[in-house]
Design a protein with these regions (language model features):
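Conserved pre-ATP/AMP-binding loop-to-beta segment of ANL
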Residues: 31-34, 163-166, 173-200, 207, ...
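Conserved AMP-binding/adenylate-forming core of the ANL superfamily
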Residues: 35-89, 106-111, 164-169, 215-216
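Conserved AMP-binding A3 loop
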Residues: 46-50, 166, 188, 196-223
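Structural core segment of the AMP-binding/adenylate-forming
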Residues: 61, 65-66, 93-171, 561-570
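ANL superfamily adenylate-forming
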Residues: 128-192, 303-357
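Conserved AMP-binding/adenylation subdomain of ANL enzymes
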Residues: 219-244, 248-355, 366
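Conserved ATP-binding/catalytic segment of the ANL
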Residues: 421-430, 434-490, 507
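Core catalytic subdomain of AMP-forming adenylate-forming
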Residues: 457-475, 491-516, 560-563, 567
C-alpha cells in the first residue's frame, strides 16, 4: 500500500525560496519587528528582522573575505544562540555549506567531523570549544580559521588561526563596502540543488555520516511542515512564540525553530542552557512547543514530584484534578483528539481548579500546539497531557527526509501512532520486512563522501529506506514498531519490539532509563536506571536514608518501588512481552 496526499509545497526545483531570501523578505516587510530574543545578564535582549538580515549579510561578506567560496564548508560549534543562526544563514547566503556540531562533542569527534566535512572555518562558542579545536587543528588540514564568540579566557591566546567574532563582523563590514552587490549576486545564482547543510547522523554501527540537504529539500520541508501538514491549527503566525533549546545541529530543532521562524515569522527565545529549560519555559510561556519524549517525561515526573511534596489539601485538590484529567484524556483519545460536550464540561471544571496553575508552573499555559518526535513516547504520558489541555501531536521524520514523513493532525489523532503521511509524501511499507519507505522532494541527496552508504539508503526509484519497521493502523496512520536492528527474537521465536516496553517503563516518574534484553533468550530482562530526583524525594518523605545514587538504588524499598513499576508495565503487555527480571 502506497499513500500520498496532495501538497501545495513546491517541488524540489520549482519556485523554491532560499532561507536567506525568506529572512530578507521578512526584514523588508517588518524590519523593526522582533524576531528573536536572548537573555544577557538576566535581561531579554531584542533582535529585530533588520538586525538579523544585516548580520547575515556581514557574515556572508566576512566569510568571502576569508576565502570561502560556494560549496565550501563552515562549521558551527555552539549552544543555541543568535550567532548560530547568523552563521548558518550567512553561510548559505554565499552558497556555502553549514555543518553543525553538538556542544558536547569531545575533541576526538570534533576532529573527525572537521576532517570528514573538510570545513575551512570553525565558529566556536567559547574557551571550551576553542580548546577542543586547538587540540586537534593540526590533524585538520582544511581548517584555516577559528572564530570565537566569547572572548573570556581566549583573548590572550596566541594562535594565528584565531579571530574574535567582533573582528570577524567588522571584516565583513569592510568587505561589504568594497563589494556591496555580493549577496544579491549569490542569491541570483542559487539553485535548488545547492547543498546548504551537512547534518551528521549518529554512528551507532560506524562513524557519523553527513546527510546532505539542499535548498530544494529545505524549501519543501518548510512549506510542508509549517503550512501544509504540520500539527499547527491554525498555522504559525508572527504572534507565535517558540523556545529554542534542542541542539541546532539536529534536524528537529532546525525545523521547529529556524525554519518556522523564517517561514512564518514566529519569535524565537533562546534558552540560556539545557539546564534552564524548565525555568525559561515558565518565563517565556511559548505558544508552540516541540520536545523529545525525554523532555515530556521529565516534565511529567516533575509534576508528580511537586505534588507528592504538597500539603494534604493541595494533594486532595490535585488528586481530584488528575481524575478529571484521566477522564478527559480517555475521552479525547477515543475521539481522535476531538472534544465532546463531556470533555468541555470536565475541562471547564478542571481548568480553574488545577489545570491552569499546573500548566503555568511548567511553562505550558499558552501552548496551543505541541509536538513530540525523534523517539517513541509512552501513551500514558500523552494521555496525561491531553487531559490537562496540552494535546501533543506525535511526529515522525528523520534527517534523511528533512523531518518530513508523518504527523498526527488536530482532530485526527490516533494514540500510539505517528500519524498520517505529510502532504506530498509517498509512504509505503516493504512487503517483506515492514520497513517504512518514503519518497518526496525533501529526501536528502546522499551522505557526504559516502556513495556506498547512500546507495544502501536510497534505492533506484528514489525511495528512502528509513530502517524503521511500521504497520498501518486503520489504513491511514502509521505505527512505528521499532528499528529493524532492534527487534528482539526470543528463544521461542516471538518477535518483540523492546522500545514499546521501554517507553512504558519510562512513563513511571521513578524510572529514568530502561533497556530491555531478550534476543535468543527464554524471557525478557531489563536494565533500569532510577530517576534520582523523584526517587530521592520519595525516599526522603519516607525517611529512608541514603548517601549515593548507588546506595539509593540498592535500597530494598527502592527495589520494591521499581518492581511495582515493572509489574504495572507487565499488565499492559502480553505474557511473552513481560519483563521477568
Amino acid at each position: 500500500m502506497t499513500t500520498v496526499l496532495e501538497s501545495t509545497a513546491p517541488a524540489a526545483g520549482a519556485g523554491f525560496v532560499t532561507m536567506p531570501a525568506r529572512i530578507r523578505d521578512q526584514a523588508t516587510r517588518e524590519g523593526a519587528r522582533v524576531c528573536m530574543r536572548e537573555k544577557r545578564y538576566g535581561i531579554w535582549q531584542d533582535i529585530t528582522w533588520a538586525d538579523y538580515w544585516e548580520t547575515v549579510q556581514l557574515v556572508g561578506h566576512a566569510l568571502t573575505s576569508l576565502g570561502i567560496e560556494p560549496g565550501d564548508r563552515v562549521a558551527v560549534h555552539a549552544e543555541n544562540r543568535p550567532e548560530w543562526l547568523f552563521a548558518d544563514v550567512g553561510t548559505v547566503a554565499i552558497r556555502a555549506i553549514t555543518m553543525g556540531l553538538y556542544p558536547t562533542n569531545p575533541a576526538a569527534e570534533v576532529a573527525y567531523l572537521l576532517q570528514d566535512s573538510g570545513s575551512k572555518i570553525l565558529i566556536a562558542e567559547d574557551q571550551e570549544q576553542v580548546d577542543k579545536a586547538l587540540e586537534v587543528e593540526a590533524d585538520c588540514p582544511d581548517l584555516q580559521w577559528i572564530v570565537y564568540l566569547e572572548p573570556r579566557g581566549v583573548r590572550d591566546y596566541d594562535h594565528p588561526k584565531l579571530m574574535d567574532w567582533q573582528d570577524f563582523i567588522e571584516r565583513g563590514r569592510v568587505h561589504q563596502g568594497q563589494d556591496p552587490g555580493l549577496i544579491d549576486r549569490m542569491a541570483a545564482d542559487a539553485t535548488a540543488d545547492d547543498i546548504v547543510t551537512l547534518i551528521y547522523t549518529s554512528g551507532t554501527t560506524g562513524p557519523p555520516k553527513g546527510a546532505m540537504l539542499t535548498n530544494g529539500n529545505v524549501a519543501f520541508a518548510m512549506e510542508t511542515l509549517i503550512a501544509d501538514g504540520g500539527f499547527y491549527n491554525p498555522p504559525p503566525t508572527v504572534d507565535d512564540v517558540v523556545l529554542s533549546y534542542l541542539p541546532l545541529c539536529h534536524v528537529a530543532e532546525r525545523a521547529a525553530t529556524t525554519w518556522t521562524n523564517a517561514q512564518a515569522g514566529v519569535t524565537i527565545h533562546f534558552a540560556e542552557s539545557i539546564e534552564t529549560v524548565q525555568a525559561n519555559l515558565k518565563e517565556v510561556q511559548p505558544t508552540l512547543f516541540f520536545a523529545v519524549p525525554r523532555i515530556w517525561e521529565k516534565v511529567y515526573a516533575g509534576i508528580h514530584i511537586k505534588m507528592n511534596a504538597a500539603s494534604p489539601l493541595k494533594k486532595l485538590v490535585y488528586g481530584f484534578g488528575m481524575k478529571l484529567a484521566t477522564r478527559i484524556g480517555d475521552e479525547l483519545v477515543a475521539n481522535e483528539g476531538n472534544h465532546t460536550a463531556k470533555t468541555r464540561l470536565l475541562y471547564a471544571i478542571g481548568y480553574p481548579l488545577v489545570f491552569r496553575a499546573l500548566r503555568d508552573r511548567v511553562g505550558l499555559r499558552k501552548v496551543r500546539a505541541a509536538g513530540s518526535g525523534a523517539a517513541p513516547i509512552a501513551p500514558e504520558v500523552l494521555r496525561f497531557f491531553f487531559g490537562i489541555g496540552v494535546v501533543i501531536y506525535e511526529i515522525y521524520g528523520m534527517t534523511e527526509n528533512a523531518a518530513v514523513a508523518t504527523v498526527n493532525r488536530p482532530g485526527r489523532v490516533k494514540l500510539g501512532t505517528v500519524g498520517e503521511p505529510q502532504p506530498g509524501t509517498e509512504l509505503k511499507l516493504d512487503a517483506a520486512t515492514g520497513e517504512i519507505l518514503t519518497r518526496h522532494p525533501a529526501v536528502f541527496v546522499g551522505y557526504w563522501n559516502k556513495p556506498d552508504k547512500t546507495a544502501e539508503t536510497i534505492d533506484d526509484d528514489g525511495w528512502l529506506h528509513t530502517g524503521d519497521v511500521g504497520e498501518w493502523v486503520d489504513g491511514t496512520h502509521i505505527k512505528i514498531v521499532d528499528r529493524i536492528k532492534d527487534i528482539i527474537i526470543t528463544a521461542g521465536g516471538k518477535n518483540i519490539s523492546p522500545s514499546e516496553i521501554e517507553n512504558s517503563l519510562k512513563a513511571s516518574p521513578f524510572i529514568k532509563e530502561a533497556v530491555v534484553i531478550g534476543d535468543k533468550r527464554p524471557y525478557l530482562t531489563a536494565l533500569i536506571g532510577i530517576e534520582l530526583d523523584s526517587v530521592g524525594d520519595w525516599a526522603q518523605h519516607r525517611r529512608i536514608p541514603y548517601t549515593t545514587y548507588r546506595d539509593l538504588a540498592e535500597k530494598p524499598e527502592v527495589l520494591k518501588l521499581v518492581q511495582e513499576a515493572v509489574a504495572a508495565t507487565n499488565d499492559r503487555f502480553a505474557r511473552a512481552e513481560n519483563v521477568r527480571k
